[in-house]
Amino acid sequence: YLAANLSRKQLLEALRYHYALLRGCMSAEEFSLYLNTPGLQLAKLEGKNGEQFTLELTMMISMDKEGDSTILFRNSEGIPLAELTFTLCEYQGKRTMFIGGLQGAKWEIPHQEIQNATKACHGLFPKRLVMEAACLFAQRLQVEQIIAVSNETHIYRSLRYRDKEGKIHA
């Protein structure tokens, strides 16, 4: 969970801190929406030709190894075009947004969807938009630093996952 170089104690404390901070900074209704599908809408954006996009804060089981919250950028059909996963924690004595993953659209989404969204959003790529949303969300929560996991410390580099490389499980 989160990063390969963190202890279990650090991970447990991060988990506790994350939910306590969110619960303290959100109304009961917002927190309930965040905990449930489809999530809490952070913003509704209109493209330069009237295209509709949303930024949502949610929990995604598929991303839970990389963090506890995910900011999604979706098109008008609800297709995720980018996602950023993070956990709020205290790291080195500072309130921190710890980014565990930043991903574009799934492989089956035509690249044209990304190009259309980028054009509609005045040249801003979907990943850039979720990064900007994360920075603004962090600012709202008075986060003191934003850090991201490196390739070397990414959770899928931990021994638990490295042992499975190249093996097929049926």
Identify the residue ranges that each predicted region occupies:
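Acyl-donor binding region in acyl/amide transferases
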Residues: E83, Y91-A170
